[in-house]
Amino acid sequence: MEEIHRYLQPDSSQQHNFLYPLIFQEYIYALAQDHGLNRNRSILLENSGYNNKFSFLIVKRLITRMYQQNHFIISTNDSNKNPFLGCNKSLYSQMISEGFACIVEIPFSIRLISSLSSFEGKKIFKSHNLRSIHSTFPFLEDNFSHLNYVLDILIPYPVHLEILVQTLRYWVKDASSLHLLRFFLHEYCNLNSLITSKKPGYSFSKKNQRFFFFLYNSYVYECESTFVFLRNQSSHLRSTSFGALLERIYFYGKIERLVEVFAKDFQVTLWLFKDPFMHYVRYEGKSILASKGTFPLMNKWKFYLVNFWQCHFSMYFHTGRIHINQLSNHSRDFMGYLSSVRLNHSMVRSQMLENSFLINNPIKKFETLVPIIPLIGSLAKAHFCTVLGHPISKPVWSDLSDSDIIDRFGRICRNLFHYYSGSSKKKTLYRIKYILRLSCARTLARKHKSTVRTFLKRSGSELLEEFLTSEEQVLSLTFPRASSSLWGVYRSRIWYLDIFCINDLANYQ
């Protein structure tokens, strides 16, 4: 790490060329593949007994041949004729992308560490915007029900690869590395294979996930940072304390240009953008911007974000990707839940002297529901049930042992219960458990060539225990005769902090 710091020192002679030399350092590829650096066998050497797929010697030779223009500049139609690319094109692409992703992440990690510490006796700006997915849960529980309107935003996707390069250019002051990145993106990769916009999120090549996730996250960070800048300093559109934006190239030039446009048309209403109750939450490619303000205020934010993104990223942003919804009238799909705010009317009888009257108190209640139709669709796609939710057997698992079949069905059921434990109504989850349990029984009955009724009579209790969730197991063991109040605690909303994403239902082939 000392050598990494030496390359990243601002006053170093290699100030503008500090990342490119790291490409040829052997420990970079050990870090990229989580290999230990204290191995007796150095990855410097290429031999048949070691996986030399990420040897830096191969990468060095590859980069050298990349810059031999007479041998490398080819068209797509000639790729089959060129022995350098051929069938190894994806292999070379993965080698460079893994190493480059590991290298380019170094300045970001060091920047984060330095921002959280003191430098020369002065406190460096500490970002209060670093939040994990865990902060989403208290936001939904505590703040969501007190807001009025929400902007459902699909983050604009980069329409050109050069936008990704320009995004990194704000942070990486290294021309050689950026040229290598640009060359790699245009020669090795196809835009359609890198990023697809068929869904709200993005899908990446499985072989280069780390590299492409880094590019996407840096792009999303750029979108979010500009929004935070506008959110914190929207009244005068100028910041002197937001340290993360001070190093950007031409950033304030674009800001001043945008201010001139808005100053002419919105001299009176510009102060309305200052909203202390504005909240921003993102999950994958979908984000929400919730406020306690009015509909005109949210409409101004929509118009403002569209114009700013188009100006800052030099791309067309369709206004249909931002929808303004009232929380009390719409449900939204976020983090796999259907979230909504409902009004519960509570009637209270009040009496004053001899007169009595009823008072209607509307109370906002936040609800998170399990999307039953998409979930049954996923189960049907994995051949656990029909599209109508009727359980069916899974013939591809019939060759496994009984314990393996029960374990696989039980694991899927427990994973679903674990992920959707934050649901305010668990009735849907018990329906999913019924589908999986009966599908498991049909699969076992098919294997033993018997009926489901006969099989359930023979091993019904054992099959039931495998589908108990961890909470149900604890309650059944600790309180064998648990009262309904204890089981009611379990049926309430529970957020698990180890939830990041839901795994594929059929992760066994």
From Swiss-Prot:
Membrane-traversing stretches: none
Provide one Gene Ontology cellular component: chloroplast
The organism's lineage is: Eukaryota, Viridiplantae, Streptophyta, Embryophyta, Tracheophyta
Q: Which family does the UniProt entry place this protein in?
A: Belongs to the intron maturase 2 family. MatK subfamily.
Purpose of the protein: Usually encoded in the trnK tRNA gene intron. Probably assists in splicing its own and other chloroplast group II introns.
Q: Tell me the organism.
A: Solanum bulbocastanum (Wild potato)
Q: List UniProt keywords, sorted A-Z.
A: Chloroplast, mRNA processing, Plastid, RNA-binding, tRNA processing
Q: Where in the cell is it found?
A: Plastid, Chloroplast
Q: Does the keyword tRNA processing apply?
A: yes
Record HAMAP family: MatK (MF_01390)
Q: Which cysteines are joined by disulfide bonds?
A: none
Name the Gene Ontology biological process terms.
Answer: mRNA processing; RNA splicing; tRNA processing
Its name, as the record gives it, is Maturase K
* Tree of life domain: Eukaryota
Gene Ontology MF terms in the entry: RNA binding
